[in-house]
């Protein structure tokens, strides 16, 4: 019998839960409005619900009235933005994911030691912009192997590398291998800077791919980790669609006769997953549902001390 295989874990990670709760608790404690620098997480459903509750999402701190509260998003911010907030008398509350903060701290420490930092990631992504701000003159961003091959450093130069927390493990491994081939003495952290949730969601998806011929990744198109999930499937020859609303689950699926995999990015609410699942069952009523558990997650991050 044809079936839907639901990946587990999927959806919200500990950092996303903490970030959303930070905004919700701030609104409960101080009332509206609460300003948020950038979308708190990259998911339109989450942002719209928080906006309805009184959150105001801004990209420029000049939009925030003096002496107001502003929350920094889960993706992190450069030190210059923290300084600007202080200069403008803003009360900053930091919802940066702890695993992103770990990368900031490592970059800052190794830059002070005189290393040049190779930062693997998407240079326009807000997380990379924040990390690069820790030591802009000592950081080079690389997105692919070609950019590794173009690096101007010698094998003797003191180099340190880290990655964006939401990268594809496949792509990161290829880039790291190229880096180590050129620079055998390059340093890094003892454990991967790709976060546990990214690794788990990609691992869970890889686990089911031999059993399916089509995958729905439920997530926002702006979400890095959701896009990487789609790429994980496509890299292994499985058709994948990134959807963020049940209306995007279309009759296209009727062209496929095999099992269907479903996963969700780390900023995707479970109710959106369930709505997409219901739409799929309307299109193909005789589908059974099977849960595939890859690993249990029990990570919890404490809310900022101000709350």
UniProtKB/Swiss-Prot annotation:
Catalytic activity: isopentenyl diphosphate + 2 oxidized [2Fe-2S]-[ferredoxin] + H2O = (2E)-4-hydroxy-3-methylbut-2-enyl diphosphate + 2 reduced [2Fe-2S]-[ferredoxin] + 2 H(+); dimethylallyl diphosphate + 2 oxidized [2Fe-2S]-[ferredoxin] + H2O = (2E)-4-hydroxy-3-methylbut-2-enyl diphosphate + 2 reduced [2Fe-2S]-[ferredoxin] + 2 H(+)
InterPro entries in the record: LytB/IspH
EC code: 1.17.7.4
Pathway recorded for this protein: Isoprenoid biosynthesis; dimethylallyl diphosphate biosynthesis; dimethylallyl diphosphate from (2E)-4-hydroxy-3-methylbutenyl diphosphate: step 1/1; Isoprenoid biosynthesis; isopentenyl diphosphate biosynthesis via DXP pathway; isopentenyl diphosphate from 1-deoxy-D-xylulose 5-phosphate: step 6/6
Binding site for [4Fe-4S] cluster: 13, 97, 195
Cofactor note text: Binds 1 [4Fe-4S] cluster per subunit.
Binding, dimethylallyl diphosphate: 42, 75, 125, 223-225, 267
Residues at the catalytic site: 127
PANTHER family for the chain: 4-HYDROXY-3-METHYLBUT-2-ENYL DIPHOSPHATE REDUCTASE
Identification of the protein by name: 4-hydroxy-3-methylbut-2-enyl diphosphate reductase
Organismal lineage: Bacteria, Pseudomonadati, Chlamydiota, Chlamydiia, Chlamydiales
């Amino acid at each position: 019998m044809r079936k839907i295989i639901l990946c587990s874990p999927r959806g919200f990670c500990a950092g996303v839960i903490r970030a959303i709760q930070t905004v919700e608790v701030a609104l409960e404690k101080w009332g509206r409005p609460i300003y948020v620098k950038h979308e708190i997480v990259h998911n339109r459903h989450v942002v719209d619900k928080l906006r309805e509750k009184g959150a105001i999402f801004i990209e420029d701190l000049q939009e925030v009235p003096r002496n107001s509260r502003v929350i920094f998003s889960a993706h992190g911010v450069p030190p210059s933005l923290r300084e600007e907030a202080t200069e403008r008398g803003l009360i900053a509350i930091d919802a940066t994911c702890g695993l992103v903060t770990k990368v900031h701290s490592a970059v800052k420490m190794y830059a002070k030691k005189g290393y040049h930092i190779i930062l693997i990631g998407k240079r326009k992504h807000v997380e990379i912009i924040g990390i690069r701000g820790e030591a802009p003159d000592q950081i080079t961003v690389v997105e692919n192997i070609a950019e590794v091959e173009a690096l101007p450093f010698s094998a003797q130069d003191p180099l340190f590398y880290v990655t964006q927390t939401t990268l594809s493990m496949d792509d990161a491994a290829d880039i790291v291998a190229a880096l180590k081939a050129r620079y055998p003495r390059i340093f890094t952290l003892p454990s991967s800077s790709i976060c546990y949730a990214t690794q788990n969601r990609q691992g869970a998806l890889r686990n089911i791919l031999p059993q399916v011929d089509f995958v729905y990744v439920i997530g926002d198109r702006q979400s890095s980790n959701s896009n990487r999930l789609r790429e994980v499937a496509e890299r292994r020859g499985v058709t994948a669609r990134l959807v963020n609303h049940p209306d995007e689950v279309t009759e296209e699926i009727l062209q496929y006769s095999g099992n269907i995999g479903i996963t969700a990015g780390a900023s995707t609410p479970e109710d959106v997953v369930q709505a997409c699942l219901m739409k799929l069952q309307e299109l193909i009523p005789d589908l059974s549902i099977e849960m595939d558990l890859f690993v249990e997650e029990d990570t919890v991050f404490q809310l900022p001390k101000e709350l």
